[in-house]
């Protein structure tokens, strides 16, 4: 999956409602004020919130999101972006959730089991789950039928437009055939219902109102991780009929139905979202929730710091300049409160656009020729020193952010306990290299010297009419000075690593939507974007870049290599050969279903081929420093799925947590994982 005051009698909620964030910061600097009483011994309802320090927990909490990560779809069955899931995970539950250690735990399913060869999985459902509307009024009872309706919606090309079909079509008997059937039927498929799906032989049945049985194509011992994804979430046929297909597909917080821990109290686009407890939440007695959770959209980290200082945010991530301001003054009150967060479960990469357009819609032939050249791409992976850029995200330990792989660390382990990316490292030849805080691992073999590659690329490209320097167009949101600062450092990294005679970064801006203003018209040379796993297997990462697959997200929506494949130019022959070879390697690995170790070894070879040919160039892991009133280690920490922003069972404190406390949290977490 593919990021976002108070004075006198003005409450935090009413202030944020009445003013934009930028205006709010100005008002705060003029009048200040103290935070309203927001603490208490318990959260909104149900269980006590975790409390390992004896602190006074918060009843209300104000978090933040980057302004460029505003929600675009409220429909979890339709959306494929993490920025959407981060919101809707609080509103819409599926079969399972996760705990703070990343372990699968019951949600609507109370238990599940597989047969001996893991081809048949049975899920047992709760009998006390209801759909409610935006006012918290009960609309319908949830049964196994709602999960049948949900899967039919996902697999129906006319309804869900091919979104989120990869998991069910890869794993469920008959799912791919049913999807193709609906695709061939065109608009007529809109009339199909879940019974039509069952009659077509799709491997899902509901023997009673509270039992679901999935039949997999092949043995799949990790299918429970697959079933945790949003492709398998419930939907109400009553609501679909009431709204109609197009309106349900584009539903929003006012007309959707809820079954998660919260409902939306208020949504101001580009400003705030506030959630209050779902009064009919099935698990209310067993989880702690906030009386109000507010998410404020932040366009600038400097503003975020000011809001935090005024207690109009309860947590912020710190950029390089703010950390420098704090650490350069030994008397700064925040020195003892700097908290290094654990890595977010995602991996960021530079996704090249192989079919770039100019602003007037004509092809950018110079870039398209350059990026099709293998030596040109290899300069990015083997020569681009990003240490200074990493400092923008982690000033104190920048190289902790280095990402050398396409698949994120921690996704899965083989039967010998080897973490998957260590297998990729072995294929790449740097498995013996360790973090040293000084040099990027992938630059150590040649010291970052790409002079021979650069010479080769320039000679080969000059011969086909490419002019230098090649302009690499990179877009940032216009309203963010932090994004501009980050891009300025990245531009200097390009200059220092490539030389201004070879590749120059051209920083451009968009107003509000990267998708609508940049990706859809194909204006970018590359986008740096993160992927969080949907389930616990490498195919979920590597399958997003393959050819000949409608579900390969990046191939269709970022690199546009799927479009190139329709009519490649002569200069793109080698590029297409590389993608075909990569696709064959991925498909061969995915065909290994009875030997986990052999499967992962084969995927590692495919990933190494991708990296050697730099079809994508990995960039960083998100390991930030923060100031916070929440214990990060109490939050959901799933390696896959979209549940990590679900605000249940958070440990919070009226007083900010300290560096020492966070170090203790980290040690306790590591001990629990290892024990």
Protein language model features and the residues they cover:
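N-terminal secretory signal peptides
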Residues: 1-10, 14, 18-28
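N-terminal lobe/hinge region of extracytoplasmic solute-binding protein
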Residues: 63-117, 257
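Extracellular/periplasmic solute-recognition and catalytic clefts
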Residues: 67, 265-279, 294-361, 387, ...
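Aromatic- and charge-enriched surface segment that lines or borders ligand/interaction sites
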Residues: 110-175, 213, 304-307, 366-372, ...
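Alpha-helical secondary-structure segments
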Residues: 139, 143-149, 209-215, 261, ...
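Gly/Pro-rich hinge or "lid" segments in bacterial periplasmic/extracellular proteins
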Residues: 187-201, 205-210, 215-294, 655-675
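Ligand/substrate-recognition segments at binding pockets and active sites
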Residues: 269, 307, 397-398, 434-533, ...
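Detector for C-terminal structural segments
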Residues: 379-426, 478, 482-492, 518-675
């Amino acid at each position: 999956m593919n990021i976002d005051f108070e004075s006198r009698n003005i409450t935090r909620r009413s202030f944020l409602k009445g003013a934009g964030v930028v205006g709010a910061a100005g008002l705060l600097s003029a009048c200040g004020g103290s935070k309203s009483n927001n603490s208490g011994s318990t959260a909104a309802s149900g269980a006590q919130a975790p409390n390992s320090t004896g602190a006074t927990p918060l009843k209300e909490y104000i978090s933040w999101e980057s302004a460029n990560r505003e929600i675009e779809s409220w429909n979890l069955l339709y959306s494929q972006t993490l920025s959407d899931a981060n919101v809707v995970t609080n509103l819409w539950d599926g079969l399972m959730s996760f705990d703070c250690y990343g372990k699968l735990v019951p949600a609507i399913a109370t238990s599940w089991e597989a047969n001996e060869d893991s081809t048949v999985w049975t899920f047992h459902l709760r009998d006390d789950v209801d759909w409610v509307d935006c006012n918290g009024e009960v609309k319908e009872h949830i049964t196994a039928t709602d999960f049948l309706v949900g899967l039919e919606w996902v697999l129906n090309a006319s309804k869900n437009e091919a979104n989120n079909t990869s998991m069910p079509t890869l794993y469920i008997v008959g799912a791919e055939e049913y999807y193709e059937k609906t695709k061939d039927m065109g608009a007529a498929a809109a009339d199909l219902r879940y019974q039509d799906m069952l009659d077509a032989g799709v491997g899902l049945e509901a023997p009673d109102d509270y039992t679901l049985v999935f039949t997999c194509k092949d043995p799949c011992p990790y299918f429970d991780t697959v079933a945790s994804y949003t492709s398998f979430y419930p939907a109400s046929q009553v609501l679909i009929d009431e709204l109609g297909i197009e309106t349900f597909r584009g539903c929003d917080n006012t007309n959707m139905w809820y079954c998660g821990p919260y409902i939306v109290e208020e949504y101001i686009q580009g400003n705030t979202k506030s959630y209050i407890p779902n009064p009919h939440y099935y698990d209310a007695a067993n989880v702690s929730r906030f009386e109000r959770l507010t998410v404020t959209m932040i366009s600038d980290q400097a503003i975020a710091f000011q809001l935090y200082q005024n207690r109009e945010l309860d947590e912020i991530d710190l950029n390089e300049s703010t950390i420098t301001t704090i650490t350069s003054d030994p008397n700064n009150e925040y020195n003892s409160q700097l908290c290094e967060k654990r890595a977010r479960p995602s991996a960021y990469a530079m996704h090249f656009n192989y079919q770039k357009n100019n602003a007037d819609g004509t092809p950018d032939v110079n870039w398209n020729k350059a990026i099709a050249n293998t030596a040109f791409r290899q300069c990015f992976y083997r020569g681009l020193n990003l240490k200074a850029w990493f400092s923008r995200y982690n000033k104190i330990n920048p190289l902790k952010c280095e990402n050398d792989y396409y698949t994120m660390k921690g996704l899965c382990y083989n039967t010998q306990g080897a973490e998957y990316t260590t297998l990729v490292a072995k294929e790449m030849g740097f498995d013996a290299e360790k973090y040293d805080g000084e040099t990027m691992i992938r630059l150590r073999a040649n010291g970052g010297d790409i002079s021979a590659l650069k010479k080769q690329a320039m000679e080969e490209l000059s011969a086909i009419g490419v002019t230098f320097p090649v302009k690499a167009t990179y877009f940032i949101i216009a309203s963010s000075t932090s994004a501009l600062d980050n891009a300025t450092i990245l531009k200097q990294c390009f200059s220092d690593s490539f030389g201004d005679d070879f590749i120059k970064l051209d920083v451009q801006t968009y107003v509000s939507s990267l998708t609508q203003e940049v990706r859809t018209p194909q204006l970018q040379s590359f986008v740096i974007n993160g992927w969080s796993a949907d389930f616990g297997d490498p195919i979920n990462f590597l399958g997003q870049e393959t050819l000949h697959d409608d579900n390969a997200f990046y191939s269709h929506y970022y690199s546009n290599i799927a479009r190139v494949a329709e009519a490649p130019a002569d200069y793109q022959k080698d590029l297409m050969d590389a993608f075909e070879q990569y696709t064959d390697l991925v498909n061969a690995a995915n065909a290994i279903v009875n030997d986990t170790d052999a499967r992962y070894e084969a995927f590692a070879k495919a990933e190494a081929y991708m990296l050697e040919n730099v079809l994508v160039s990995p960039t960083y892991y998100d390991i930030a420093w923060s100031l916070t009133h929440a214990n990060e280690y109490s939050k959901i920490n799933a390696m896959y799925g979209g549940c990590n922003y679900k605000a249940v069972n958070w440990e919070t404190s009226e007083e900010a947590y300290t560096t020492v406390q966070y170090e203790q949290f980290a040690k306790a977490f590591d001990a629990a994982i290892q024990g």
